[in-house]
């Protein structure tokens, strides 16, 4: 898919990388499946860059509009996961 990630131009390169890695993990949850621990770790790093719930929600909505992938739905599934790997159903 061709789309751009919702990034804040005020972030450092390292912060942008962390956000992109989290969004790529969301993509993997839909496309191939992902280890729940890995995704939780990516989310913790993401929250260091984006601590505000409002900004997290805005990024999630913008990402879903661009990609069709819901970070919110993935994280809800991870929160309640009983398996070591998750894969979202389209």
UniProtKB/Swiss-Prot annotation:
InterPro entries assigned: BH2638-like_sf, UPF0223
Top-rank taxon, per record: Bacteria
Parts of the chain that traverse the membrane: none
One of the Pfam families matching this protein, by short name: UPF0223
HAMAP family for this protein: UPF0223
Family to which this protein belongs: Belongs to the UPF0223 family.
Name of the protein this chain belongs to: UPF0223 protein lwe1035
């Amino acid at each position: 898919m061709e789309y751009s990630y919702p990034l804040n131009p005020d972030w450092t390169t390292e912060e942008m990388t962390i956000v992109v890695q989290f969004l790529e993990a969301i993509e993997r949850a839909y496309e191939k499946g992902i280890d729940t621990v890995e995704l939780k770790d990516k989310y913790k790093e993401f929250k260091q860059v984006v601590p505000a719930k409002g900004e997290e929600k805005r990024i999630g909505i913008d990402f879903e509009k661009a990609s069709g992938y819901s970070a919110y739905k993935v994280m809800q599934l991870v929160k309640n996961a009983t398996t070591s790997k998750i894969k979202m159903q389209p």
